[in-house]
Amino acid sequence: MPDELRAEKSFQSKPYDSLKNKSEFDRVYQKGFKKHNLFFSLFVLDLSKEPPKGKEGFKDPLSCRLKDKKTLYLLGLSVSKKVGNAVKRNLIKRRLRSLTLKHAALCQGLALVFVPRSDCYHLDFWALEKHFLEMLTSIKNYIEQSLKRLEKRNNSYLCETIKRLF
């Protein structure tokens, strides 16, 4: 086959990287925000708040994986055999990956872990998208509110210490 007739293969790089090992999943489970509904659980860790490299005993923090490559967010999928056979599990994983690709701007700077339940298979893509967006927006709002509260506490603490000194 001549080279001119061959189709150009232009692969777009995906904007996410996957969580690779148990320690990365455990970090998101322990330090991240959790949200549950009937169909899946969503664990979200804000990577902008991850400690820098070398602090708190982390050899390679998750936030460094975003800076090294051109990835926007990290994605982990944990689909157990209770959900169904391999065909059902792979369908759920494909749908969840495409959801995060579709809404990559919302997921930017986050590490996401999905844990689907057995009822998740019966949802169509649009219903799954609706539940995903509700959960993600509520988690992002919670993160923003907690940051504001933390900033207020730190500012008031600084004001009190300055008043004590002078």
Swiss-Prot record:
Q: Is this entry keyworded tRNA processing?
A: yes
Gene Ontology MF, one: tRNA binding
Q: What does this protein do?
A: RNaseP catalyzes the removal of the 5'-leader sequence from pre-tRNA to produce the mature 5'-terminus. It can also cleave other RNA substrates such as 4.5S RNA. The protein component plays an auxiliary but essential role in vivo by binding to the 5'-leader sequence and broadening the substrate specificity of the ribozyme.
What this protein is called in its record is: Ribonuclease P protein component
Per the UniProt entry, what are the Gene Ontology biological process annotations, in alphabetical order?
tRNA 5'-leader removal
This enzyme's EC code(s)? 3.1.26.5
Query: Which organism does this sequence originate in?
Result: Helicobacter pylori (strain HPAG1)
Which PANTHER family is this protein grouped with?
A: RIBONUCLEASE P PROTEIN COMPONENT
